[in-house]
Amino acid sequence: MAGQVVQYGRHRKRRNYARISEVLELPNLIEIQTKSYEWFLREGLIEMFRDISPIEDFTGNLSLEFVDYRLGEPKYDLEESKNRDATYAAPLRVKVRLIIKETGEVKEQEVFMGDFPLMTDTGTFVINGAERVIVSQLVRSPSVYFNEKIDKNGRENYDATIIPNRGAWLEYETDAKDVVYVRIDRTRKLPLTVLLRALGFSSDQEIVDLLGDNEYLRNTLEKDGTENTEQALLEIYERLRPGEPPTVENAKSLLYSRFFDPKRYDLASVGRYKTNKKLHLKHRLFNQKLAEPIVNTETGEIVVEEGTVLDRRKIDEIMDVLESNANSEVFELHGSVIDEPVEIQSIKVYVPNDDEGRTTTVIGNAFPDSEVKCITPADIIASMSYFFNLLSGIGYTDDIDHLGNRRLRSVGELLQNQFRIGLSRMERVVRERMSIQDTESITPQQLINIRPVIASIKEFFGSSQLSQFMDQANPLAELTHKRRLSALGPGGLTRERAQMEVRDVHYSHYGRMCPIETPEGPNIGLINSLSSYARVNEFGFIETPYRKVDLDTHAITDQIDYLTADEEDSYVVAQANSKLDENGRFMDDEVVCRFRGNNTVMAKEKMDYMDVSPKQVVSAATACIPFLENDDSNRALMGANMQRQAVPLMNPEAPFVGTGMEHVAARDSGAAITAKHRGRVEHVESNEILVRRLVEENGVEHEGELDRYPLAKFKRSNSGTCYNQRPIVAVGDVVEYNEILADGPSMELGEMALGRNVVVGFMTWDGYNYEDAVIMSERLVKDDVYTSIHIEEYESEARDTKLGPEEITRDIPNVSESALKNLDDRGIVYIGAEVKDGDILVGKVTPKGVTELTAEERLLHAIFGEKAREVRDTSLRVPHGAGGIVLDVKVFNREEGDDTLSPGVNQLVRVYIVQKRKIHVGDKMCGRHGNKGVISKIVPEEDMPYLPDGRPIDIMLNPLGVPSRMNIGQVLELHLGMAAKNLGIHVASPVFDGANDDDVWSTIEEAGMARDGKTVLYDGRTGEPFDNRISVGVMYMLKLAHMVDDKLHARSTGPYSLVTQQPLGGKAQFGGQRFGEMEVWALEAYGAAYTLQEILTYKSDDTVGRVKTYEAIVKGENISRPSVPESFRVLMKELQSLGLDVKVMDEQDNEIEMTDVDDDDVVERKVDLQQNDAPETQKEVTD
């Protein structure tokens, strides 16, 4: 027997065909959300307050500091927040200190700074009652970037950019005459040496001594018209502020504020890290020949002789000396923007491949401290040096799509940036108030205006492109949404501008971003998913784990290192399926491996690392596809995406053929209920589970507190599906930490169960499965195999209007008693009532305009004391196709103190209607391999083809759907599924390490089936066997959210567009079917003139004609001739608005006045039937 039995959770065993043992547990799949938010609460907020403190007034007398903060208890708990449409948030209170320097007085106060949304345990936020997810954003990391480009003459050129987190960009470029220019903040370019002079290197000689003599520098100095620091400063000022009178002082302060002021310019810690890494001498001296010795500055000894070529080993040896500033120089700069001395490291090397033995200087930035978030003069000089080195052939250009140059902004950082915006707006207000208020009586509370802070947080959660309504169709959709990475959003790319290169799969995505799971359509490649083992480091770079290889013994160790994409570039990584002996050494002398994106074969001694698992390449959703290795990538993409659209079924069933990921995905998705502590189950009910904690002290276990786990029962999910949790533990069970206690929707026994295992045959049947259509047995309808429950929410508000308040009541004008049968005395539908389309759910009347009463009404009013009420019926009715059973009714009243109602609303009623939807013709189904189709026919069970033992099969699929799509995985799943069913087992075939052909065939033989997996089928209608044997097996098929009930739509009359008077389009607007240009051509080709005329007039925008037609049909009269369509008038007005004189003439060249053809005077054509009924003799008569 191939494979070994593995336990998944408490209740499920699977036969696992994996050959590679798991060395690392999968991490918690939603920690990308939870960890980032924890960081924000722990450090991010404090960092913000520290950055802004102290706020001083213009005289420097008052100083406001933010000392500390705390979060209070939320006003409503999670459930209550959802019910009340409130935000799940806690009050943020900040301790503020105000210092008055004149008197030395210190005032401290705790100031309320608004309610701050809290993250739930499952990584979501509840905003206005709806669960939302903040998607992580992929952006370009702040750093120094060097690019290669070809100019119009075909010459190779370079440009460089220093990109900060916020602040001015600095760019270097060369022109056709080999002059190097600099651009400050996208303005006009200046010779590079002007910026150097402004930094304090005044004379030409100083600049040449600094950067080393080369042709580019000489050309630039010739072009440079300035001669000293002052002239250079004035020159820069004129470029940045044209038209203003330049002075040296103004120029200094301008340059200072652009680059050296921490409030205006911020590299952030990640920018400092990347800049130091890029400009560090270690990477730049690699494989270079020294033109001078490297000297330890502290001891004065020579570490490396002149003429040495530095390989990687040599550089590692001298690393300490390089970091202790070997060959460093300190420059005292006078008259510059910054008066502090500048320290750099410079080492001369020989220009590669140069016969004349020329040298160039490699300058490093002397490694500024990580606390220095601004750019330093040393950074600018070192980046210029790198640029000149590139021109000499030393150094590397950067690939912007490499994940070493792209980083993630997760929830915490996105929130922090938003909070910073709010605080900086508040800072302005505080400064203004400081100058107005009286210093004696002033308090921190009076200075601080929290509105801008609250507004910026609300704006972020409510309307940011990255704050999204959670996709809650099933647990996998939930999980994937929380792990999504988007390159769109503020500060990111736009769909239109994103090039092919950005969207493409890059070698650095390996183990970090899934190469398969991405949407089809305009967002392809811009929205990605995090790989299964990946995690995000403190700088926001994605890391993936590798097993370390011992450099001496060349054996795999237990040490696991997480590497970022640029760290990985230095190492050779072996694949996870490399053969190892029992000591962890590679068995083959030549090992398949990766190095910088090249898949090659190298000697086993060269290996540095090895992959942790074959599934580290793909995301959680893709890892749920068995036999992924046998599917074409395009179909695998569809399979991964369609699993997220599977509707939770009433009776879910885990797949016979899984991958082992189902349990992990279900546990981490947030849809299941997991134990927060180890304990013993004391009580189980359908709506709650009680667990007594088991605590171990001094080796003795004793009982602790009681944990209560409430279960959600038949709630509506964000996608309108049924969210229901069911206990899977029994009283007395001892449960471990993080064990599943209750299944959520689409789960069975602690595993994800998106569909059902059904018996499928690959065969045609009277052409009903043409074009991927699916033929299904009626058994699946009768036995509720694919029945799903859907819950829709409808609400009705009673508002205050100008004419008086609206009223929710049972007393509705012109409505029969039978229409009110489901309403209670308040006018609200009963729970449990069965309602059909058009039934009243909430009776509501709205006051109409008050009219003058007639004499009779006045008399009645005098006798009975009541006026006939002038109200119109505005009741909430069941929309088309939404009938069902009323599940729940919620009523909110302003009188009862419901402060969550929006202004002007007195009463709000919410009605939940539940539908049980059986599977229909027209519903969409799919497998896990991108094999999708629409149900074309539901065949009675007795007519379905049946197996030799008399069992009818469930589904017939078209065999032509397999070869051209190249998703052979579905065929292997089919065979292995049948074997698993016959053996009564569940199997796991992990991606890239699953069952191979031999395993599948041997399992089939073990199950007593034919070796080719085919069988004789008999036609259910005739009882005759089919000519050929047919592949029959068990496939896991899902019902997708594209259901025909939601798409079916019909209209007779309905709303019309205001300008063109044509019917609206789409089901949501109750629109019509568009009869477009091509359809008109089709009718013209047939010569169907009258059909065409009525489609273009009565049925569309002939406003008068359609009313007359409706009238004629109701009265049984003949339909009158059409008048002018409204869109023709619109066209005329359009042309007239362009200044053209447009008139409509009849055959006698008399102008037809279009304005006359109005609703009041309709042109009617009357036929004198006595004369002749030919159309030519019809006369035009205007009534």
Swiss-Prot record:
Listed under catalytic activity are: RNA(n) + a ribonucleoside 5'-triphosphate = RNA(n+1) + diphosphate
Q: Which Pfam families match?
A: RNA_pol_Rpb2_1, RNA_pol_Rpb2_2, RNA_pol_Rpb2_3, RNA_pol_Rpb2_45, RNA_pol_Rpb2_6, RNA_pol_Rpb2_7
Question: What is this enzyme's EC?
Answer: 2.7.7.6
Q: Which GO terms describe its cellular component?
A: DNA-directed RNA polymerase complex
Q: Which keywords appear in this protein's UniProt record, sorted alphabetically?
A: DNA-directed RNA polymerase, Nucleotidyltransferase, Transcription, Transferase
Read off the Gene3D superfamilies from this record.
2.40.50.100, 2.40.50.150, 3.90.1100.10, DNA-directed RNA polymerase, subunit 2, domain 6, RNA polymerase alpha subunit dimerisation domain, RNA polymerase Rpb2, domain 2
List the molecular function annotations (GO) for this entry.
DNA binding; DNA-directed RNA polymerase activity; ribonucleoside binding
Q: How the protein assembles, per its UniProt entry?
A: The RNAP catalytic core consists of 2 alpha, 1 beta, 1 beta' and 1 omega subunit. When a sigma factor is associated with the core the holoenzyme is formed, which can initiate transcription.
Under the heading NCBIfam families, the entry gives: PRK00405.1, rpoB
Member of which family? Belongs to the RNA polymerase beta chain family.
HAMAP family linked:
RNApol_bact_RpoB
Q: What is the recorded function of this protein according to its Swiss-Prot or TrEMBL entry?
A: DNA-dependent RNA polymerase catalyzes the transcription of DNA into RNA using the four ribonucleoside triphosphates as substrates.
What is the protein name stated in its UniProt record?
DNA-directed RNA polymerase subunit beta
- Organism, scientific name: Staphylococcus aureus (strain NCTC 8325 / PS 47)
